[in-house]
């Protein structure tokens, strides 16, 4: 399975391109990529970039897929799935737990479903920590054409989705969902 790192965000709350911000001598996005590379189920890591940050992302030596639509995570996932089934994460997720990702991919493979997404008991989804079939791209395309850009709604509208109940998993795995939004968030990973 492909590991797809979404790197097309605008970093408004952070104040600069957070994915290039160095933490312990390395850009944030590389911390995320290294965690993905630690997953036995991930065969290849790609970066999904916006046209604006394509060149910066190409500097890291990974295959870069350009999200020309740039309408949010939905078009990032859509772009990633052009290469096949993918486990998709945000580029600002430096605390990914490889065992958790491998667990989700195993559930995805065993389920035969179009996607496998962690879900909290209140119904909230973690769509940027999920496995998607390349066939999910058709659903995304249809929604994008209709101007419906919320990834969570696209997942909820699909009939063939495997949901993983987060509360039933090891407590430590929840750290995998942590993402950096503001500079104040960095203290959690700079220790």
From Swiss-Prot:
The keyword Ubl conjugation appears for this protein: no
Enzyme class name: transferase
Reactions it catalyzes: Mo-molybdopterin + GTP + H(+) = Mo-molybdopterin guanine dinucleotide + diphosphate
Binding site for Mg(2+): 92
Cell compartment(s), UniProt: Cytoplasm
Entry EC number(s): 2.7.7.77
Keyword list, A-Z: Cytoplasm, GTP-binding, Magnesium, Metal-binding, Molybdenum cofactor biosynthesis, Nucleotide-binding, Transferase
Pfam family, one: NTP_transf_3
Positions annotated to bind GTP: 6-8, 18, 67, 92
Gene3D superfamilies to which the protein is assigned, alphabetical: Spore Coat Polysaccharide Biosynthesis Protein SpsA, Chain A
SUPFAM superfamilies recorded: Nucleotide-diphospho-sugar transferases
Coiled-coil segments on the chain, per record: none
Source domain of life: Archaea
Record function comment: Transfers a GMP moiety from GTP to Mo-molybdopterin (Mo-MPT) cofactor (Moco or molybdenum cofactor) to form Mo-molybdopterin guanine dinucleotide (Mo-MGD) cofactor.
Protein name: Probable molybdenum cofactor guanylyltransferase
Species assigned in the record: Pyrococcus abyssi (strain GE5 / Orsay)
